[in-house]
Amino acid sequence: AVRSICKRIPQSEWELVERFVREFRMKQEPNPPMEALLGELKEQGYHLFLMSNTSHRFRAFSKNIPSVGYMDGIWISCECGYLKPEREAYVDFFRKMKIEPQESYFVDDSPANIEAGIRLGMRGCVYHQDMPELRRNLREAGIDLKDA
């Protein structure tokens, strides 16, 4: 899987792909603070979408990830043939989810993915597994949140 992905992305992203594949299962654990944030955003009427570089297996095991239940739409790379941060991945995501980049706020753990989204008109921030920082970034972007 790693070789197949790395053939289609810049070499500067190879290490990130290798780390992602190694840690993928660990990152699928429930994340109560993230679930609380997603629930709060849904209560306020925000539409939430997942854009993920992942395999077909995601659909099967995503039922066990509570955060996925908050999503209005899910885009996974294996179903379209593009990977973040490829421009075509974002264009396909916008089209399939019927969203405008300028109306979106993108959160991702890869700076390259955020930069690609920004180039196409999105606003966003890199998520460093730091919930207070993420909440601060969302507030600074004009997204109202409760105090945590």
Annotate each predicted stretch with a short phrase.
Residues 2-6, 20-25, 58, 62:
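Hydrophobic alpha-helical core bundles mediating ligand binding, dimerization, or RNAP-core interactions
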Residues 6-7, 94:
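Residue-level preference for well-ordered alpha-helical positions
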Residues 8-49, 87:
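Short, acidic loop-to-helix structural element flanking the phosphoryl-transfer center
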Residues 39, 55-148:
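Asp-based, Mg2+/Mn2+-dependent phosphohydrolase catalytic module
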